[in-house]
Design a protein with these regions (language model features):
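Short hydrophobic alpha-helices and adjacent helix-cap/hinge residues
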Residues: 2-12, 22-358
Length: 358
């Protein structure tokens, strides 16, 4: 009898140990940190990428996902503007990024800007890695023609969702025309890179959808020298009331690359027209300003989507959104250089006023 009782107690002990072990494993699994991989198209600290990154992290924190508590973040910078800007180098960066992503095994991948989405996210369609994009300039439907990943913007339907970078250029021209009522024409400058072509299409689409109080002319600068020549031509055009510099990658005759900091610094030194800023942060680089894309807010939108995925939501059921917010920002030092007096009511409505030189 004692022998049988001992066997029963031993069996019960084994069951208890197994139950406790299973329960501890469940607790351990639930407390494991969520893993978010943020893939940048550009270099660390880039004027477009870094604000989006910060917005993603801030939104995750607000949703309860905090580093060193329940969140692990890894980032990789493809550096496809300044350094790795040929098709071969971009493809090599995509290969390296995919390897790092698969090793990290993220709960969600966040891609910032088009090159990361185009070369990496589209290779992960219908994989077990959820993807949230931010800063997409290309049309989602155009990417879908290359690799099917999208049923519709309201219901993407696969494992990808995100934020389309609406430029709000029509709003920018309306505000500038109110600021300077005599504006007849705005010169828009773009470059022929993949992102530049996408921005060109965005501008045309947005202008078709809304009426603006002035005319506009698009110039595609294929080289650094051509860009310089076109800026000087705009200076000489009496009808040009402003320029919209959206050429962010140019090469000179010797193959040297010029990116946003180089291009905008030269523009501020040589342009005689107020510059409408595409990016909120461009005013801190010396541009006049106006209504500009708020990249931090756009990243925050993407971060909110990533938080939904971490909480169990399916990316395919989360609607793709336009970047909702533009910021009204002005550089007072630049306005003084140009001899422009910004009305008090517009300054009071501004989200930010920059007074320091870049």
């Amino acid at each position: 009898m004692r022998y049988k009782m001992g066997r029963v107690l031993t069996a019960c002990s084994v069951v208890m140990v197994l139950l406790v072990s299973w329960n501890m494993g469940s607790v351990r699994a639930s407390s494991l940190p969520h893993r978010v991989f943020i893939l940048h198209s550009y270099e660390a600290g880039h004027v477009c990428g870094q604000p989006q990154h910060d917005g993603v992290v801030a939104a995750l924190r607000k949703a309860g996902f905090k580093e060193e508590e329940n969140l692990e973040i890894e980032a990789y910078f493809m550096d496809t503007k300044r350094k790795n800007n040929t098709p071969e180098l971009i493809d090599e960066q995509a290969r390296l990024a995919l390897g790092k992503i698969r090793d990290f095994r993220p709960s969600v991948l966040v891609t910032l800007d088009d090159n990361a989405f185009r070369t990496v996210a589209l290779q992960l369609v219908d994989s077990d890695i959820p993807v949230v994009f931010s800063g997409m300039n290309g049309q989602p439907e155009d990417y879908n023609q290359k690799t099917p990943w999208l049923e519709s913007r309201p219901h993407p339907g696969h494992n990808i969702t995100g934020v389309y970078e609406k430029l709000h250029i029509a709003d920018a021209l309306k505000i500038h025309s109110r600021l300077l009522p005599g504006v007849k024409k705005v010169w828009v400058f773009v470059d022929p890179s993949p992102t530049g072509r996408a921005i060109s299409k965005q501008i045309k689409l947005e202008m078709e959808q809304e009426s603006v109080p002035c005319s506009w002319e698009m110039k595609i600068a294929t080289t650094w020298e051509e860009y310089q020549k076109e800026i000087r031509s705009a200076n000489a055009d009496p009808e040009a009331g402003a320029i919209y510099p959206a050429a962010l990658l140019l090469k000179d005759g010797e193959g040297h690359s010029y990116t946003a900091p180089d291009i905008l610094a030269w523009t501020v030194q040589n342009s005689k027209k107020p510059e409408i800023a595409l990016n909120y942060a461009f005013t801190r680089m010396g541009l006049f300003g106006g209504a500009a894309v708020d990249f931090h807010a756009m990243g925050s939108q993407a971060g909110q989507m990533a938080a939904l995925v971490l909480k169990g939501g399916a990316p395919g059921a989360i609607p793709i959104e336009d970047a909702q917010r533009y910021a009204l920002v002005f550089n007072l030092n630049r306005s003084k250089e140009l001899g422009i007096q910004i009305p008090a009511d517009i300054l009071m409505a501004a989200d930010d006023i920059v007074s320091a030189k870049p």
